[in-house]
Curated annotation (Swiss-Prot):
One of its GO terms (cellular component) is nucleoplasm. Coiled coil: none annotated. A motif (Nuclear localization signal) lies at residues 428-432. This is Myoneurin. Residues 270-308, 350-361 have a biased composition (Basic and acidic residues). Residues 386-396, 435-460 have a biased composition (Acidic residues). PROSITE patterns: BTB, HMGI_Y, ZINC_FINGER_C2H2_1, ZINC_FINGER_C2H2_2. A zinc finger (C2H2-type) spans 472-494, 500-522, 528-551, 557-579, 585-607, 613-635, 641-663. Residues 24-91 form the BTB domain. It comes from Danio rerio.
Length: 810
């Protein structure tokens, strides 16, 4: 993957945001064409937009350009240049682009347009111009001189490539000859092929002629030739012939791609005399190998010189990138290996790699082992700092550890191989995740990682188990999540981002599945069907709620205060607010508070007058969706609510509850019977109701409610009241004449509570003992009263000792 600079990455992200109209807060209008863009980006490139953006503000984000000065086609090119840095224009468009750039105040574009029109045919970005100026890049057809035919140039390029191919073939032949030389034998008895890399100067010359291509099979961004450390001081003549100035001694043979790496014995190619004289040669090799690796990684070029000057100090094996380090083995293994190497060297045969020596080093992809307790870390550090002195100290330490290792190996042979539990756990994970042939870049990262682990392990006394991966946590609210993707979706709540927008109603959502569910409202799709009835739903949660409400399924959410059960947790949460009195939703207009957000929304529509729900049949609008549903039942004739007592159909549940009051109130039933069925109620019912005046249900006009309440309270508070029981009241016919006499000391008063009508003062005639029926008002709108007289003790609140209770008869 090519390296992308910070500026290129920023431009690419801004371009993608503009293409998606994400965070675009400016609209540029040219005639009928409109372009969405970002204020700050336009203002950064244009002086015109920097002034217009301030004047426009938030109320009017549209900026209109003059089509005569800036056409839509030219503005598209300039807009592309602003967001990408590429300005592509033909010779005929240079003048128009220059005019538009001058109008918009873009001096950089004006400077480009002032160049010669003959030399500007396709003005690109500065990056592309640098590629054209690079002599190593392939020539484009426009760069050839017009007098030279293009066909001849192509033939010349083909000849150059063929010549470079011949050079590579000669290198392959030298490689095949080098493969015939005796090599180390792998642990399975195979002889891995060894390929000699070409000289740096020759390969760089060939690659420069052919262009900047990467080698076949090599990863992107990796050089074709990589110097390796020497695998052996004894090399074949073919090796020495291919490496002038003895440079091949400092380079080793790499394995072909796809071939397994073979880790040689620490004494495989070493002089037998050195093995016999120095029993700690393995550790010297490991330390020297680490020194050479550090020099090679830091870019030092004096590896070959140091190796040739001191051939005795050069170890037989030097670890390349990703190669395992060798752990010192016990004395028995070292002695056995030394004897085997000496015997094989005298016979002239290749020393074989044994299983014992194989187990002491880590395989490819395994972590470096932690030093055992018998090893002295200070000796390792001293060896890395100095040369011969470090070797002597290491030899002494090795002899000391050999004596200890002999006893340990006899008692428990596994101590010399297994180091720690942590190593075992990490090795298994890495072996599973890194199966197959890994890239060398990954091996370098592993080396760096395990080197840091070795530093940590050097200071540890006890082996600690591998800790689990930390769960992602929100740094704002502290919520924990199982995955980073869940945390990213959660952060949209705090940032207020809703990137998913509906194209039909412009509603926005935080997640894509929310938009998918919302689209079912427009399409009418209802994929979830109830198994008990034919109801269908757009969401699964709606189906679950339906089954719990209408089909007897258990309601799992119960109130801890009153025991009421609910189908959803949200309904329970709203119900608990009734007990706590919490009303978190407040109206900004009048300050009224509500327990639900939906109730607040409906309340706000009273202030604004908004009625978004419109009937498709008659066009009537409503503020609440339930009102529209009840209204549609008038057109369809559907009456889902029916009274069980009389069978009356009702449109809504509220209408049914209001109707049930007729059956529960005896006087309301009497009124209903008289009005609807012309049936006079029986007198026994009236007589029975008079036995207790305090419990007498009276149905009187609303303006007499206050008087009745005072009468009942007076009757209850009085302990010595006596009620004069009268015979059943005869209702006089309307034509009966009544005598109403004026009196200064009235005995009976009828007065409306609101004072809308004048007081009526009357009394009985001397010869009359029965109550009378009084009618007053205009003809056609007369109100009839049945007068009943009660004698009660006078109180401070009552003005008269006699109170009249009246009942209206329709």
């Amino acid at each position: 993957m090519p390296h992308i600079t910070h500026s290129e990455f920023l431009l690419e992200q801004l371009k993608r945001q503009r293409e998606r109209s994400f965070l675009c807060d400016c609209t540029v209008s040219i005639g009928q064409a409109q372009y969405r863009a970002h204020h700050n980006v336009l203002a950064a490139f244009s002086e015109y937009f920097s002034t217009q953006s301030v004047d426009a503000g938030r109320e009017d984000p549209t900026i209109t350009l003059d089509p005569e000065s800036v056409s839509s086609a030219i503005f598209e090119k300039l807009l592309t240049y602003i967001y990408t840095g590429d300005l592509n224009m033909d010779r005929e468009e240079i003048e128009s682009v220059q005019k538009a750039a001058s109008y918009l105040g873009m001096p950089e574009v004006v400077a480009r347009c002032t160049l010669s029109q003959d030399n500007i045919k396709n003005v690109g970005s500065p990056m592309r111009q640098a590629e054209y100026e690079d002599p190593r890049s392939p020539l484009s057809p426009d760069d050839y001189e017009p007098l030279e035919p293009i066909s001849e140039v192509e033939e010349r390029e083909l000849l150059r490539e063929d010549r470079a191919g011949d050079d590579l073939v000669s290198m392959d032949e030298a490689q095949s000859s080098s493969e015939q030389t005796p090599q180390r034998v792998g642990k399975r008895g195979r002889k891995p092929k060894t390929r000699l890399y070409e000289d740096e100067f020759e390969v760089e010359t060939i690659s420069a002629q052919r262009g900047r291509g990467r080698g076949r099979g090599r990863p992107r961004g990796r050089p074709r030739v990589r110097p390796l450390s020497s695998d052996s001081t004894d090399q074949s003549p073919a090796h020495q012939a291919m490496s002038p100035n003895g440079s091949s001694t400092s380079r080793g043979s790499g394995r072909p791609r796809g071939r397994p790496r073979v880790r040689p014995l620490s004494t495989a190619n070493e002089d037998p005399r050195n093995v016999e004289d120095d029993p700690a040669a393995n550790k010297d090799q490991e330390v020297e190998k680490g020194n050479e690796e550090q020099k090679k990684e830091t870019g030092e070029k004096d590896d070959g010189k140091n190796d040739t000057d001191n051939p005795e100090e050069v170890t037989a094996f030097k670890r390349g990138r990703g190669r395992p380090r060798i752990k010192p083995v016990s004395t028995e293994d070292q002695t056995t290996n030394s004897e085997n190497v000496t015997t094989n060297a005298e016979d002239g045969s290749e020393p074989a790699k044994t299983k014992d020596s194989e187990g002491t080093g880590r395989k490819r992809g395994r972590p470096r082992s932690k030093p055992v307790s018998s090893e002295d870390p200070e000796s390792v550090i001293s060896v890395e700092i100095s040369g011969e002195e470090a070797g002597e100290e290491t030899s002494q330490d090795a002899e000391k550890h050999t004596e200890e290792g002999t006893e340990d190996s006899e008692s428990n042979p596994g101590n010399s191989v297994r180091i720690s539990k942590r190593k075992r756990i990490l090795s298994r994970k890495l072996k599973e995740s890194q199966a197959g042939d890994e890239e060398e870049e990954e091996e370098e990262e592993m080396d760096d990682e395990f080197e840091n682990d070795n530093e940590d392990w050097a200071g540890e006394e006890e082996v600690k188990p591998v800790q689990d991966k930390h769960r992602p946590i929100c740094n704002i609210c502290g919520n924990l999540f199982s995955e980073m993707s869940s945390l990213r979706r959660h952060m949209r709540i705090h940032k207020g981002l809703k990137p998913y927008q509906c194209t039909l109603c412009t509603r926005s959502f935080r997640q894509g599945n929310q938009l998918k569910t919302h689209m079912r409202i427009h399409t009418g799709e209802k994929p979830f069907t109830c198994t008990s009835c034919d109801s269908r739903f757009a969401q699964k949660c709606q189906l679950v709620y339906h089954c719990r409400m209408h089909h007897g399924e258990e309601k799992p959410y119960k109130c801890e205060f009153c025991g009421a059960a609910f189908a959803t947790s949200s309904n329970l949460k709203i119900h608990i607010r009734k007990h706590s009195g919490e009303k978190p939703y407040e109206c900004g207009e009048c300050g009224k508070r509500f327990t639900q957000a939906s109730t607040l929304m409906y309340h706000k529509r009273r202030h604004t007058g908004e009625k978004p729900y419109i009937c498709d049949t008659c066009g009537m609008a409503f503020a609440v969706s339930s009102s529209l549903i009840a209204h549609n039942r008038k057109h369809t004739g559907v009456t889902p609510y029916i009274c069980l007592d009389c069978g009356k159909p009702c449109l809504t549940a509220g209408e049914l509850r209001k109707h049930m009051d007729v059956h529960n109130d005896i006087y309301s039933l009497k009124k209903h019977s008289i009005l609807k069925h012309n049936v006079v109620p029986e007198l026994e019912t009236t007589q029975t109701s008079k036995t207790d005046p305090t419990q007498c249900p009276l149905n009187i006009p609303i303006d007499h409610q206050g008087l009745i309440a005072r009468v009942r309270s007076a009757l209850v508070d009085s302990q010595d009241h006596e009620i004069q029981m009268e015979p059943p009241l005869p209702i006089l016919p309307p034509e009966t004449s009544l005598t109403i006499q004026q009196s200064a000391e009235p005995q009976m008063i009828i007065q409306h509570a609101d004072g809308s009508e004048p007081s009526m003062i009357f009394q009985h005639a001397e010869a009359s003992e029965a109550p009378m029926l009084i009618q007053h008002g205009e003809p056609g709108e007369q109100v009839s009263y049945v007068v009943e007289q009660y004698e009660i003790p006078a109180t401070a609140e009552m003005e008269h000792t006699q109170i009249v209770i009246v009942q209206t008869i329709d």
